[in-house]
């Protein structure tokens, strides 16, 4: 039995009874959200998890992500990915552009997101897995997702309200 199975079942019971919205449990994609070794996806699926994610850290290794997508597809789990190449964003404080330069703040280049969106879409095509790309912020990422959807890949994406309202152009 998965050691968190009781917690997942309790959460599902409480939410089905008390929540005003439908709540679906997610599990970790890699052990400890470290991006190094896959978590026990099969046992989490049996416990009631419907999707897996490494939350805001994202998986930084493409081989681990490929294996994770293959494994998740075996159990019909959706992989939720935070698309950001941390090697390009370390110390970043805001969108890279005129305002970051003017304020003297290290910027987060849109390429840091788009390179992960691209690789995730390629890996989703290779593995036939379902993937959801979280809180995208660039038009380039949206275009990559459009192309993936045109190929009938199981790729979905979303943008956060913060990315729509708090831009450097506002």
Predicted feature locations:
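A glycine-rich helix N-cap at a beta->alpha junction
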Residues: 13-28
């Amino acid at each position: 039995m998965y050691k968190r199975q009781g917690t997942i079942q309790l959460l599902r019971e409480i939410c089905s009874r008390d929540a005003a919205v439908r709540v679906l449990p997610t599990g970790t994609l890699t052990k400890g959200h470290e991006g190094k070794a896959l978590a026990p996806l099969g046992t989490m699926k049996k416990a009631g998890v419907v999707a897996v994610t490494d939350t805001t850290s994202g998986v930084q290794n493409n081989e681990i992500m490929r294996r994770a997508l293959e494994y998740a597809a075996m159990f019909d789990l959706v992989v939720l990915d935070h698309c950001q190449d941390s090697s390009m964003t370390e110390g970043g404080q805001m969108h890279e552009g005129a305002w970051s330069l003017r304020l003297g703040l290290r910027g987060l280049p849109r390429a840091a997101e788009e390179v992960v969106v691209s690789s995730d879409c390629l890996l989703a095509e290779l593995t036939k897995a379902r993937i959801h790309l979280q809180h995208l912020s660039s038009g380039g990422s949206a275009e990559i997702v459009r192309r993936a959807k045109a190929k009938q890949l199981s790729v979905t994406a979303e943008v956060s309200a913060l990315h729509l309202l708090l831009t450097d152009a506002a």
